[in-house]
Amino acid sequence: METADILVVSGAFFFAAFVKGITGLGFSTTALPFLVYAIGLKEALPLLIVPSIVSNLVVMRDAGHFQQTLMQFRRLYAAAPVGIFIGLVVLMWLDPTISSAVLGLVLIIYCVVSIIQPTFRLPTHLARQLEIPVGVTTGLVNGITGSQVIPVLPYLLSLPLTRDVFVQAVNICFTVSSIAFAIGLAWVGLFTIDTTQISFIGLVAMLVGLKLGTPIRDKLSHKSFRKAVLGLLLLLGAGLVLRPWL
């Protein structure tokens, strides 16, 4: 990878971590569209592994309720890797512009859900029945696009969870998915020593962005900044969807 590309990757990681520090929006989801525009989806996916796992582990440590949450959603977490491996097979078969368009659609759905923040509630029995399908589908979308938020995010939002349990549930899912994704990427030949080294370089930029973003949280209008970032991601997602026809 050229020096210019490494600088772009580091810049995307810094910005995504800075945004995460201020708003709590997902690191990978924010960084991914910038990387796709710069270097392509298949090239971008392995670079996110190390920073994603590290950032998720930090949040998992701080959120608490680990064992309780792990047991509550164990079937969902066990199902996600199955979908990831299927999704990676599909990714290797798909035309890159199509998989990028799917990512764009996922980003649009994510932004709409995040902006609207629906308050619907799933009945307990239905939520239980949907655990495995949601896990497999989230893994499938993850394998094809690299995004880990759909449909697990709206699913967890539909449950009566406390904020800490919700954050922990999301981050356990992200961490399990990232580890399975790393194994899958290595299996299909995308996660190599070179990409690992670049991923560690990006980790430094991510940590700096997170450190600088977190103290600013109380000084900026959190809601306005969050909506601005979501609006930007929405535009980037729309661009990825329209790209094959432009």
Language model regions located:
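Hydrophobic residues within alpha-helical transmembrane segments
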Residues: 11, 15, 50-57, 74, ...
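Transmembrane helix exit motif
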Residues: 56-65, 96, 102-127, 214-215, ...
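Structural signature of hydrophobic alpha-helical transmembrane segments
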Residues: 5-6, 11, 36-53, 97-107, ...
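Selected transmembrane alpha-helices and immediately adjacent juxtamembrane segments
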Residues: 1-38, 121-170, 177
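Residues that define the loop-to-transmembrane-helix transition and helix capping
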Residues: 42-45, 97-100, 129, 164, ...
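Juxtamembrane helix-boundary/capping and inter-helix hinge elements in multi-pass membrane proteins
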Residues: 38-41, 63-70, 157-165, 189-192
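Selective hydrophobic functional segments
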Residues: 47-96, 179-223
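Hydrophobic alpha-helical transmembrane segments in multi-pass integral membrane proteins
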Residues: 44, 86-91, 140-147, 181, ...
